[in-house]
């Protein structure tokens, strides 16, 4: 991970970074994200670039160096451009719709499933079989999308369920006999 840690993070226009004690705060047009730096890792702002530094080459510091650089880069991208995950509903009668801020999914259960968006997450339903999860925190966007997918995972025989837009479902052959 140390090669990733060496790369400086360029700050786009409109993104401000403040480093206090052991915490970094990134503010941009879409919002503010804060994160506590691991012990020993320091961040220095040089013009419109951030440089992440480590105190020594021990394994723990090398690992935290790359991790910190990657997470700070995700914070910068989140507050400037944001993140989104797209999901597809595959199956007859499977549909999604918005009710206020809530997402309501009819996915073959006896009742519709309602999903409340966590703080900082926004749902969009561009079509009845498509869901878009948007937000500035990459981890929260991914976790929310995974939570929605876990409601009905794609099954391997017909591929019915909720899948990521670019996900390829490994299909299985059905039973050979029986006709």
From Swiss-Prot:
GO biological process entries: cytoplasmic translation
Molecular function per GO: rRNA binding; structural constituent of ribosome
Database matches in SUPFAM superfamilies: Ribosomal protein L6
UniProt cross-references to PROSITE patterns, sorted A to Z: RIBOSOMAL_L6_1
Keyword flag Ribosomal protein: yes
Keywords: Ribonucleoprotein, Ribosomal protein, RNA-binding, rRNA-binding
An example Gene Ontology CC term for this record: cytosolic large ribosomal subunit
InterPro entries named in the record: Ribosomal_uL6-like, Ribosomal_uL6-like_a/b-dom_sf, Ribosomal_uL6_a/b-dom, Ribosomal_uL6_bac-type, Ribosomal_uL6_CS
This protein's record includes keyword Ribosomal protein: yes
Entry similarity comment: Belongs to the universal ribosomal protein uL6 family.
Purpose of the protein: This protein binds to the 23S rRNA, and is important in its secondary structure. It is located near the subunit interface in the base of the L7/L12 stalk, and near the tRNA binding site of the peptidyltransferase center.
NCBIfam families noted in UniProt: L6_bact (TIGR03654)
Oligomeric form and interacting partners: Part of the 50S ribosomal subunit.
Name of this protein: Large ribosomal subunit protein uL6
Organism: Syntrophomonas wolfei subsp. wolfei (strain DSM 2245B / Goettingen)
